[in-house]
Regions:
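Residue-level signal for beta-strand positions within conserved beta-sheet cores that form or flank
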Residues: 34, 71, 136
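Second-shell loop/turn segments in exported
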Residues: 46, 52, 117-119, 142
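Acidic/histidine-rich, surface-exposed loop or edge segments in extracytoplasmic proteins
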Residues: 40-42, 114, 136
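A short, structured surface patch at a secondary-structure boundary
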Residues: 57-113, 119-121, 125
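Bacterial Sec-exported substrate-binding components of ABC uptake systems
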Residues: 2-7, 12-13, 22-64
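Short alpha-helix boundary/capping motifs
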Residues: 25, 94-97, 140-141
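Charged, glycine-enriched surface loops/patches
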Residues: 128-142
Length: 142
């Protein structure tokens, strides 16, 4: 199980790094299309309108990766169990008070929509919620 979590963590890290690194490059050519396409763990191609500024992370593993990437200030919503996790208390106290959007087993789509995110990150086990996010034009990666 630990090996599986480590593999998933590394995969999510790769996705997130590719998403954020693309926005960090220097480009002297004016681009009319800042679209970024990422492939999530389900093999879906997800198109983003540039680097996300408002992110919801409903799973502590993806949240910890965002913290390690130094982009926790872009988080607008996190998992419901944040107050019980030592990680937040030690390295990102400011996240504890963000709106709770769900757990690794369920997610509140209405709460997510109210936060007007540029990107929602969910665990793969919540893939049945993807069509609901797509109906609302909210990019989601799993």
């Amino acid at each position: 199980m630990k090996k599986f979590k480590k593999i998933i963590s590394l995969f999510i890290l790769g996705i997130l790094m590719s998403t954020f690194v693309v926005g960090c490059g220097s480009n002297n050519v004016e681009s009319k299309d800042n679209k970024v396409t990422v492939v999530d763990q389900l093999g879906r191609e997800v198109e983003l309108d540039g680097t996300p500024e408002k992110i919801i992370s409903s799973y502590y593993i993806s949240t910890s990766l965002l913290i390690n990437l130094g982009v926790q200030d872009k988080l607008v919503g996190i998992e419901a169990k944040a107050k019980t996790r030592e990680m937040y208390k030690k390295v990102a106290k400011e996240l504890i008070d963000l709106p709770a959007v769900g757990t690794s087993k369920e997610i509140n789509i209405e709460e997510c929509a109210n936060l007007n995110p540029d990107l929602v990150i969910i665990p793969t086990r919540l893939k049945e919620f993807i069509p609901k996010f797509e109906e609302l034009n909210i990019p989601v990666i799993a």
